[in-house]
Amino acid sequence: MKREANSRQRSAVSGQLPSLWSADAHVRRRFVLGCWLASVLSCSALDASQLPPPSSAPIDFARDIQPILESACLRCHRAVNPKGRFRLDSRAAALRGSEDRVVILPGRSAESRLIHLVARVDPEKQMPPPGKGEPLTAEQIGKLRAWIDQGVKWDAAATSRQPKIEFSVAPTIRFVSVSGNEAKFREHTGLRPGVSGGAANFSYEQQLDVDTRFSLSGRALPRDEDYAVKLSLDRRDVGFVRAEFEQWRRYYDDTGGTYAPFATPSFRLGRELFMDGGRAAFDVGLTLPDWPRVTLGYEFQFRDGAQSTLHWGDSTQGGVVKNIYPALRFVDEQTHILKLDLEHDWRGTRIEDSARVEFYDLSTRKEQASPGSAFGGTTTPSSFVLVREQASHWQGQNALGLERQLTDWLFGSAGHLYSRMQGDAGFQMNTVTAAGGGAFGEQWFANQILLDRESHLFSAAALAGPWANLSFSAAVQSEWTRQTGLGDENLQVGNPAIPFLFPTPITLNSQLDTHTLTEQFGLRCTGLPHTVVFAEGRFQQEGRGTFEQQVGGAEAFLRRTDADADLRELRAGFHTSPWVGATVSASYKHRETRTDYANLEYVIVPGGHPYPGFLRQRASHGDEVDARLSWRAANWWKMQFGYRLTATDYVTATDALPGFTPGGAVASANHDAHTWSMGHTLTPFRRWTLNASASYTDSRATSAQNGVASVVPWRGGIVSAQGGATFAWTPDTDLRLSHAWSRADYAQNNFVGGLPAGLEYDQHSLQAGLTTRLKRGATMNLQYGFHRYTEPTGGSAYDYTAHSLLGTLSLKWPEKP
């Protein structure tokens, strides 16, 4: 029993790995073993009393079970490349279980993990996963329970009747009409006005032989620049070849800021802004029995296009200057990644090694109206600031991880990650006329910036128990990083056609050393009936050594600062099912951070500024309360309620600065937020399904600058609500209606000292449609959509109203029963 319980806990935490600073999150997700253990302490208890009862009728596999497996399970748990190494294509494979546990216990359906998953009594693990298929009905779960209780009888002939070829395609056509700001609508929805169409999805799968399967799937929506294709050839106990390509487009609004008192309160660039992104990947793998699993691959990622920015340019009207003129940024980004993954189980020890080599290139150009640019109304600015940036680097990293069940009650893991990055960058800023010629203004150059970073990370973790319904976890992680930078800089003010006013170049160099130690502990108790009680703590100590030096220029300086940071985070709570159909959970978290700065060496030339050497301490402390209730009031009514409170105070301490501050600690900021949420799912009448959910967040923030017109306290709320209804009109036709609404009202009237702060908007989306199942495996979907957005803080510059019509015909061969 201890071994089985420990296996359940180990599975609950496997693979939940956080990402750190690395650009390649995949390696770190598979490596960092220190922080995932807390999740096992807060997972909810499984309440078997919530399971639908088993069917009382005798079960026929071909009639009752095979259709359920085909519709909900076999896409992921078939013979080739089964998820979690769990197969449902034969009785022997199903009873063998997954990679770490038995899933089906013949004659004991209430204890079988398969039933817990499909019944969704474990909120941390549900099958089919959300978004991968519809949840099983109580009737289907009852049939599965009866099948298991009756001995898991299997009809091999029924399984062999599965088609060797499966094909599906869903051609679609869409019409969209927009009045108002079309660019804002595109930014919110990703839809372009007019007529568009393509294949919403397509797939082809063929079982070449008993061990080999080929699959092809994707989508193609040409006018949306939305494409995807995946190919896979898998042979059981041999290996696989996989390739995929994906491209998408994201749109941006070309409208800048708004200042109502101006004669022309807002501007638009008058061009379509979008960013194309995509990736291509190719993997080859070996999956030979009793040999290490090897995967060798290549991946290419890219972004290319133009996006709007929130750092707008100047508009001068009536002698008043406001930063509201829209700015844009062109981006050309490419990343090449080589990868090698090894996995192997050796004498009870799981060994994983992931290596990555990355080559990265980035080129950007920003266009923005220059400060003091003379224009008003709809006139083009007289001058622009052009900012060009280039960056490239290579990065190599390797992660080695080990895990082992040391005893019946102790599971351990350890790992090491090494990473090295070297790169260079450049920066140029020019002020030009509207025609592209030189203009008076800032000319700023940093032609060569060299960067180097090296990091080592070690981690170890252990999960012990259970003993007398108690489990304990502990993890420690240590990371050391050194970053160095060296570059030149030349800031010049004037006109490129005449000598510059400040032609003196400068040289900058810096070094940042960081050492971080993190400890995490947790305790979990399941001794109370239907209840889990947990407590956990996370502690972090970090030391940072900073060296910065500027040689030359008007404000040369040298700074050497040590910083000691400390974090403490404590959390405790419970999850209980006091009666059938009800679950209650609550938790409390307290978090404190403090950073002390010691300026060991600080030299400033006369006329220079003391910041940031004038900072001595930063600290924060916050509390969070979370409570949730889930209650099945009746067989046809399930409801959920939630509440969360977060409150954080910030303190800053400084040195004295004559004429400005006497120094010492000051309460620099405060933030409070209350969030209420609720949800209902109802089936009050035959053929009707209703759902509704809503949440409201009320926030308040203040800062040390209270009383100054340009930085005012603010308070406001965000509310969102969704509701829907589905009516089974006929056995083959469903009608659907849904509505989503959100609103924010935390805008501040702050015109006296600056631009408005915050936002006020109102957004509605209504969807109505029908789905009808035609003959020969075809399904038709028709849908109407209504969208409306208003933003009072932007006048009418961002508002729009839109209507959409969508039609999709889904075809499948062979026809599903």
Residue ranges and their predicted role:
Residues 180-186, 226-230, 244-246, 254-260, ...:
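Outer-membrane beta-barrel translocator domains and adjoining extracellular loop/strand segments
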Residues 69, 209-215, 237-241, 290-294, ...:
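Repeated loop/turn-to-beta-strand initiation elements of outer-membrane beta-barrel proteins
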Residues 157-208:
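Outer-membrane beta-barrel initiation region
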Residues 176, 772, 801-817:
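Outer-membrane beta-barrel "beta-signal"
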Residues 45-162:
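Aromatic- and Gly/Pro-enriched helix-to-coil junctions and flexible linker segments
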Residues 173-179, 187, 218-224, 235-237, ...:
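Transmembrane beta-strands of outer-membrane beta-barrel pores
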Residues 169, 200-206, 229-233, 282-286, ...:
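Residues on the lipid-exposed face of transmembrane beta-strands in outer-membrane beta-barrel proteins
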